[in-house]
Curated annotation (Swiss-Prot):
It comes from Sminthopsis macroura. This is Transthyretin. InterPro entries: Thyroxine_BS, Transthyretin/HIU_hydrolase, Transthyretin/HIU_hydrolase_d, Transthyretin/HIU_hydrolase_sf, Transthyretin_CS. The keyword Membrane does not apply. The modification Sulfocysteine is found at C32. Highly expressed in the choroid plexus. GO terms for cellular component: extracellular space.
Amino acid sequence: MAFHSLLLLCLAGLVFLSEAGPVAHGAEDSKCPLMVKVLDSVRGSPAVNVDVKVFKKTEEQTWELFASGKTNNNGEIHELTSDDQFGEGLYKVEFDTVSYWKTFGISPFHEYADVVFTANDAGHRHYTIAAQLSPFSFSTTAVVSNPKD
C-alpha cells in the first residue's frame, strides 16, 4: 500500500513538473501577467473546473476581490488580469478545493488553499502560480519571470 501511494505521488509529480511551467511569455500569452495552473495529485491529471479567486490587499488591510475564474481542460486560467491592472501589492490566490473534491464524492480536509504573495515590488514581472491538490494536502510553487516585449 505504501509503495502504491509513493508511486502515485511520483507520477503526479512528473505530471506537475512537465506541465506546470508557464506559457512562453512573448508568445500568445505575452499580456498575461498572472496565470494559474492546478493539478490533481490523486488522478494525475489537470484539475478541471476549479474555482479560483484573486484578492488584493487594500490600504485598509482588507482583501478585495480582484479577479476570478475557473480552470480549463488543461487545469489553467489565463487572462485573469492585464499588465495595466496588475500593479504592485499583496495578492491572495484562493483555490476552492472543497467544491472540486466534492464533485468526486470526496470530503476533503481543506476548504480552500490560499497562496499569498507580493507582486511587482522589484519591477514588473509575470507570475505563474501552480497548485498540486489532493484531498488532505496541497503544494504550491511559483514561477516569476520578466515579461518580453
